[in-house]
Amino acid sequence: LEIFKQHNLNIIWQTGKSFSEKAHELIAAINSRGITTHSFIKEIELAYGLADIIVSRAGAIAISELCVVGKPVILIPSPNVAENHQYKNAQSLVNKNAAILVKDSKASNKLVDEIIKLQNNPILMKELSENIKRMEFKNAANVISDYALNLIKK
């Protein structure tokens, strides 16, 4: 966290309940106003809107949201999921140059460097944003509801 402060990076950190107290302690220890923690962010679209770079797990719902948002993304797939599906999700975006992948086991050593490198590369930030935005499934709700209605009619 100290390095974020040194680089004048502002962080909106959704910690989850289990890490919330520890995160508050860590931030208090470095006395940084630029880092805020939340056990859960109810209006995530506001946090996404404020972000220049988003760091996220790689679940299907998160990736769907990130495609709509169209911001540069660093994905850290959870290793604690069935059939390593988050890694596969993340890798599919990486293969389309739409995200950066950092393995969970490497995150403590590599994540900060990746954030700083990305922040200092506006060309890559723009490229990642454009590529992930292209993956947005437009009108998904209409497609799903039409499909469901067609199933009911059968």
Model-derived segments and their meaning:
Residues 137-154:
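C-terminal alpha-helical cap of glycosyltransferases
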Residues 46-62, 71:
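Acidic donor-binding loop of glycosyltransferase active sites
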Residues 1-53, 86-90, 98, 102-111:
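Donor-nucleotide binding loops and adjacent catalytic segments primarily
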Residues 124-138:
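A short, well-ordered alpha-helix in the C-terminal region of glycosyltransferases
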Residues 56, 72-83:
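Short hydrophobic beta-strand element within catalytic cores of glycosyltransferases
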Residues 16, 59, 77:
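Short glycine-/small-residue-rich Rossmann-like dinucleotide-binding loops
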Residues 108-120, 149:
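Two-component system phosphotransfer/interaction surface
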Residues 48, 66-67, 72-74, 94:
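Short alpha-helix at the nucleotide-sugar/activated-sugar donor binding site of glycosyltransferases
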